[in-house]
Amino acid sequence: MLGAVVVRVTDLNLVSVATPGRVQVWATRLGSGAPVPNVQLSALAVKYDWQDGSRVVSRRTLAPVRTDAQGLATFSLRDGEQLSVRGQVTLGGQPHSAQLGRTENELWTGVAERARALIQTDKPVYRPGETLRGFAVLRRLGAGTRLPYTGPVTVRLRAGYPDATLAQLTVKPDADGLVRFSLPLPQDVKIGGYSLEVELPAAPSASNPNPEPDVSQVPVEVRAFVKPLFTLDLSGPQEVVSGTPLTLSARGELYQGGPANVQAEAFMVDGYASDELYPDYDAGDNGLRYQDLNSDEVYGENAAPGIDPKRRPDQTLTLRGGRATLPLKLQAKNGQPTRYAVALRARDEYGRDVWARRPVTVYPAAIKFVQPRVEGAERRRVSVAVQQVGSGKALAGRRVQAEVVRVFYVTQPDGKSVRREQRISQSVLTSDAAGRVTLNVTLTPGQEGGYVARLSTQDSAGRTARASLDIGSVYKSGAERQAPTLVLSPERSRYQPGDTARLTLNTDLPVGTPLLLSVNAEDRGQVKLIQVTGPTMTLTWPVTAALGPAFSVSAVAVRGGQTAQAFSGELLVPRFDQRLDVQVTAGSEVKPGAEVTFTVRTSRGGQPASALVTLAAVHESVYAVVGDPTPNPWRFLWGATTPQFEIRSSSSQADDGRGGGGGSEAVFYRSDLREVAAFQAVRTDAQGTAKVTVRMPEGLGSYRLSARAFTRTGAAGEARGEQRVGLPFAVRLIRPRVLTAGDTGSVAVSAADRTGQGGNVTLTLGANGQTQTANSPLQGGSATRLFSIKAPQDAQALTLTASAQRGANGERDGLRETVPVRPAGARQLLSGSGSVGADKAGGNASVSLKWPQEAQPESLTLDLAATPLQLALTGLDAALADPADRWVTTDALSARLSSNLDLAALAGPFGWPEVRTRALAQARRDLASLLALRGSDGWGWTEGSPASAEMTARALDALVQAKGAGLTDAVTLQVVRQQAELLLKKSPNSPVLAAGWRGLGPPLRPCDWPAPG
């Protein structure tokens, strides 16, 4: 039997340069690369549903076009459309064809970004029931311009899972492009992460009748949180020689002012050893790049290190007067630089963690190799700095042993690959006056493998310092015919408008070969056809503002059936002319409730500039819970972005070449404890100055001032300041975040003295109309006493007053706070039945209702009913509703989840589909909230509380019941099982946890896990 293969022979090649909304096609000969005019191009534009990628929303056949004398033609696209192109032409009397986008979705680079909104909220984290206030500064993006957006926009607060919109409103900006908005959060809003979005519609046109809107967003956290009471910092050397004693300094400071005297635990984290050096390709450009989220603030120092909860601390220390020292003696591992992180943890009176971290690198010798640079293509120039450990002093005249090796792999007869090394060179280098050594290395074609430089030297004590550095690689050609070479090297990586960009093009293509240059910035691009004039060419391009904030140059050629491409990488055009200099100043420390005036100054290029300024003053402790996510305004508007373009070819691609409280008789109780002292927008005058007067809250501590400025012509900038509110002698109240009705608990009252006078203080707590008093001496500037309190049964809040007084007639301070009181737990269904008959003495019947032995009921409510139907309807609305209080706890969620699952189970047999639907819907919400409360080692009472056996057991019981109802799966239970096992090892005598762990059932076998994807 004979088989036949149809081979289509063509000498037509299509190259596409796609940018948002446009695809340019270049038709060439496949062999010679010569442009082909008059090629008829037909195109199909398809738009797919962005959620369901297989569903077609629209399909358009575009009008055919023909290539011009340079072989170029252009197609326009609507937002979201993807293109496929087919070209046909007659050459030498024979038909030739080529196609791009065979799968109908290849030629697409996204949708053009037409506008942005810089969103700022009055604080980054909210409690349920609070009101979110915000600003958004809207700008329309143009070629080198950022002008105010003038149309109405939609502001919405969205939950990620399940996808839902919690609040939404439409607002219109003012002449500065500023919108103001307020979004009250429901009392029953679930804790977790949300997204605050601003949607900016685009104007429709005949060519793009349904443009997609731009959406800017910023994360918002909702938590039932209590702010930390103190800061914790570690300072000291970040470099040390192995075995040398190292002392770090720990410092704790109360947010309200004064030292924090606390116990702390130290952990040595990581200990990663490596002598590898990595070139810094950033070259200091990070501050010039686009920023849509201040990730360093949000995810930096606020993130707790991942330490095994079972791990014991390496050291413990006590901060007295807010200070302590941490002596260490760290060793380098394997004779290599070893990077450690020293983590310090302290806890407040309620067990909430406060962390500090300090990176420390331990070197095997007193010399280090740093700041590697690798330059060039085939001929590489490698330079490394030789410095003294600790001081960073450059070491000139240092002799360094250098070896270059080629690392490659050889395939054995049995098919296994064996690693081999070949020494390429060996030399002795001497560091120059700047402390750098330089090594020249040639990457030899045909000698494939990775090239590595190994450096070593010795310090005065005879200890050896080593480093290794990847220089580059030579790849084995996978093609039988030699691929054309095309290398594009820019003269530099930064330009300013008015400059001329110069690039060197190296190629082995014949003289006269056509080259298509493409210059792209943001969503814009332009092409130019040139010819090869020799193996080395200098290309120039004028740099205009339209090429900002970053552009790239690419070259493409077709030859011998292959397509060669070269890219310059991103070339930055930072718009420093659009950077505003902003200053915000405050006064010296003021008393609580005092009026202060903040002064904001804006200038541009050294000259005063009138600008819109958003000003916020927020208590610094809030940012210890969640960092400020608002990006730098200049980087948000003018930061460099990667140009949106893509080049494709219908032929194969060639391989690439890389004050103080007084002594008055009555105590003044501070009660204005707002976290946000100011949140407003102002405009600086023609002299670039604005003054804002506010009344400060009565909460003590530092308030962060954030000033972000914008001009209508696109300039932007920001600055920070600080306003402190303080007293030389002050009282602190350390209380629980929430109380349960009828509970008995404790609170701490503390005096903080910043005068250094010492002496005895009288601490007083008032609650429920009763007053408790204790005397205590000041030690290290503080004195603390615990007092008992009892939560009322029928109130939604408990007001506490705390005061401190030095001696009989000395300074005094008072504080008034309100603690929410929640109901005494959600209902748990216990049911039973019996019969009352005439033959029963007195017509009585006994029914036993039992709860688990380890349970501790807070209250019992008995419902009697003549029929099961009447019983099921008792208290139905209360069971289906979220609690009226705003505090979310593990025990309440677990109990309510269990109750709603019981109710759903009853509703089925009784034929109440509506009741069952409502109960299951609430159960799903409770389940999501319960899973969100899970910490790294189990469940605590609330979010952020240490995991406890009791709370974890309650959560496990509820999860097992949820699995039985089909609301969760075995994989989720497997994850919590592992946490429960770890917690059970720490609390082996906890019967409630043991029972909850057993209720999870057997663990999953490997074959039970779902397949990836």
UniProtKB/Swiss-Prot annotation:
Superkingdom, natural source: Bacteria
UniProt-recorded Gene Ontology molecular function terms: endopeptidase inhibitor activity
Region entry Disordered, spans: 804-844
Pfam families, sorted: A2M, A2M_BRD, MG2
Family: Belongs to the protease inhibitor I39 (alpha-2-macroglobulin) family. Bacterial alpha-2-macroglobulin subfamily.
Stated name of the protein: Alpha-2-macroglobulin homolog
Native species: Deinococcus radiodurans (strain ATCC 13939 / DSM 20539 / JCM 16871 / CCUG 27074 / LMG 4051 / NBRC 15346 / NCIMB 9279 / VKM B-1422 / R1)
